[in-house]
């Protein structure tokens, strides 16, 4: 299901918002269950097979978090195992066939490609699984409540394309009593942000996508000017599609009294590559800085390690590309 589909806008979204606040009036945990159920419906709509790997991921990571929580002494090896499993599965789904293609080209072999179906949103929920496990190991979470965990990982506004939010921040908001009641200001702001994101997606991104699709279809007859326009249109398609989706996610969350971080800050106004990096997919940059760049030493270990750490973060951002 997509945010810009009629079924979501006219049925799933209003019903979820209504049931969420009604359920909170009965008992707070019921509101969380509404989010979990709505998220499962949203994710599995038309592709129920996607739930299999997501379910396996949930079992592995929540089980790992419980094991880590029960150990009184912090152990890096216990933490490393679920991280290795998460990253390994992510690389398997996204890059195995890419690796096979390069091996075949380099060695002149003909190893068969694997029939791999990429789970929707795997990059986003995998990285947030890592964030949850790390937060548990560092003692940032007071408890590892199963309902809170599921509501965090499955939260449908961010499940497929982000933005990424820290588990401590999200779970804290989810449990604040004042956020469980309808806030008309947040509702109005949420509708506004969602509408702007919808316009970005439907009127701008999809229009450029049509032009890009036509250009690729007729690429053999394309002139130099056509190719230049293709590059330009594609950059706008990517930005407005991703930015529009993120805006819609932020808008939906505002309706539910949850604050998600803004993900883009006019990146095409950047005056340098470094400035662009800071403006594009902001939540991912913060995640990679916190969980990769700083633990590796950041810029504290000399110029060579600074460049190496930056390169590792760059590849981390590349792995996240296309969800």
Segments and roles (model prediction):
Residues 1-323:
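Membrane-embedded transmembrane alpha-helical bundles that form the catalytic cores
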């Amino acid at each position: 299901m997509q945010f810009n589909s009629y079924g979501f806008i006219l049925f799933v979204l209003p019903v979820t918002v209504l049931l969420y606040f009604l359920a909170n009036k009965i008992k707070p945990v019921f509101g969380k269950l509404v989010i979990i159920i709505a998220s499962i419906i949203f994710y599995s709509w038309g592709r129920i097979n996607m739930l299999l790997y997501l379910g396996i991921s949930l079992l592995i990571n929540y089980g790992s978090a419980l094991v880590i929580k029960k150990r009184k002494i912090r152990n890096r090896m216990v933490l490393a195992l679920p991280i290795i499993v998460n990253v390994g599965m992510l690389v398997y789904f996204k890059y195995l066939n890419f690796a096979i293609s390069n091996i075949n080209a380099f060695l002149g072999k003909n190893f068969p490609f694997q029939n791999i179906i990429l789970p929707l949103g795997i990059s986003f929920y995998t990285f947030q699984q890592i964030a949850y496990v790390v937060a548990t190991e560092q003692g940032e979470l007071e408890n590892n409540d199963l309902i809170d965990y599921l509501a965090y990982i499955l939260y449908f506004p961010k499940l497929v394309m982000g933005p990424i939010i820290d588990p401590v921040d999200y779970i804290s908001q989810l449990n604040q009593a004042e956020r469980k009641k309808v806030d008309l200001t947040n509702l109005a702001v949420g509708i506004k942000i969602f509408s702007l994101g919808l316009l970005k997606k439907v009127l701008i991104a999809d229009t450029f996508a049509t032009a890009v699709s036509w250009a690729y279809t007729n690429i053999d007859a394309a002139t130099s000017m056509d190719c230049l326009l293709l590059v330009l249109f594609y950059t706008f398609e990517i930005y407005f599609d991703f930015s529009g989706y993120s805006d819609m996610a932020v808008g939906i969350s505002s309706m539910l009294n949850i604050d998600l971080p803004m993900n883009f800050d006019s990146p095409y106004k950047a005056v340098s590559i470094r400035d662009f990096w800071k403006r594009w997919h902001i939540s991912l940059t913060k995640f990679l800085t916190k969980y990769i760049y700083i633990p590796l030493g950041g810029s504290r270990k000399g110029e060579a390690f600074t460049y190496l750490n930056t390169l590792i973060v760059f590849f981390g951002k590349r792995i996240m590309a296309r969800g």
